[in-house]
Amino acid sequence: MDVTSQARGVGLEMYPGTAQPAAPNTTSPELNLSHPLLGTALANGTGELSEHQQYVIGLFLSCLYTIFLFPIGFVGNILILVVNISFREKMTIPDLYFINLAVADLILVADSLIEVFNLHERYYDIAVLCTFMSLFLQVNMYSSVFFLTWMSFDRYIALARAMRCSLFRTKHHARLSCGLIWMASVSATLVPFTAVHLQHTDEACFCFADVREVQWLEVTLGFIVPFAIIGLCYSLIVRVLVRAHRHRGLRPRRQKALRMILAVVLVFFVCWLPENVFISVHLLQRTQPGAAPCKQSFRHAHPLTGHIVNLAAFSNSCLNPLIYSFLGETFRDKLRLYIEQKTNLPALNRFCHAALKAVIPDSTEQSDVRFSSAV
């Protein structure tokens, strides 16, 4: 039953003698402006929107994403890779993690171009393309969240166990950790895919994205468990900072070192939360008995909502390089030196130096650079 119609019916019964209104016009502006917002939040409200209206809204959001976020994500992640590789002799342990994170984000940003033009979720109609896109997205999604989780743990080790972690926090161990994270991301995707594919070999319309067991794994392993670990790490870090309150000379430097990682994690949480809520709502709904397998896809039932949450998830990969550039003091210094080496225009060099320094005052202070590189 329509929530809006039910509410109006209750209101009329409270006032006897009120004439019954005419049948509601499903194309009235009032319904179309108010109801979709509620429906999008509940992943259940695009029923009153016509196909044309859903297309217009999706096209508008896709244009905003393509104009404002996609260039930042594509150029920014490439810039992170180029600058850090150019200064590989000065590469720190956090730089290794951010390079791998930039690789995963760059792949997701490139993949987002398909989603931007997939306004009707049409590629979910093709089983092979649907499965390929789901595998491609999950591998890089897992790698992003796993890298963020490991970076939070590494940050806690660097701050809380600074004197005892010199043997553990080495570049060799960092490279080994990156390799294991990529292997874990691929395994978390391919192992469930192999298992469920053997069970659905006879289904012509089988898509990896529609398997409920895979969706439960994505929500738990790709969102709930990692952020529980991240929350624990940051709670321990806060306790360390509180204990170091009397060391006023170290506290500002440590807060600057934490600001970048904390911002990246918060942006990831905000961007990926709608996607996981959308999937969770679908998982909590009971499957209709006798429904055709191809028609049970929640993205078929709610294409506009699925499009919105996908764009929100892709936005994380676009915002990560922006946060990294603005809050990473070591990276800004490398970027300034890279521009000076590659250009012979003194005016441009002075402008870039002033712009990078204006982001956070005293960002080029040598003591802060040494501290940021150390952690």
Curated annotation (Swiss-Prot):
Extracellular topological intervals: 1-62, 121-132, 195-220, 281-306
The PTM entry states: Ubiquitinated; ubiquitination occurs at the plasma membrane and leads to proteasome-mediated degradation.
- Signal sequence span per UniProt? none
Report a single Gene Ontology molecular function. steroid hormone binding
Gene3D superfamilies from the entry?
A: Rhodopsin 7-helix transmembrane proteins
Membrane topology according to the record: Multi-pass membrane protein
Which PANTHER family does the record cross-reference, listed alphabetically?
Answer: G-PROTEIN COUPLED ESTROGEN RECEPTOR 1, G-PROTEIN COUPLED RECEPTOR 182 AND ESTROGEN RECEPTOR 1
Q: Can you state the subunit structure given in the record?
A: Homodimer. Heterodimer; heterodimerizes with other G-protein-coupled receptor (GPCRs) like CRHR1, HTR1A and PAQR8. Interacts (via C-terminus tail motif) with DLG4 (via N-terminus tandem pair of PDZ domains); the interaction is direct and induces the increase of GPER1 protein levels residing at the plasma membrane surface in a estradiol-independent manner. Interacts with RAMP3; the interaction confers proper subcellular localization and function in cardioprotection. Interacts with KRT7 and KRT8.
User: What protein is this chain from?
Assistant: G-protein coupled estrogen receptor 1
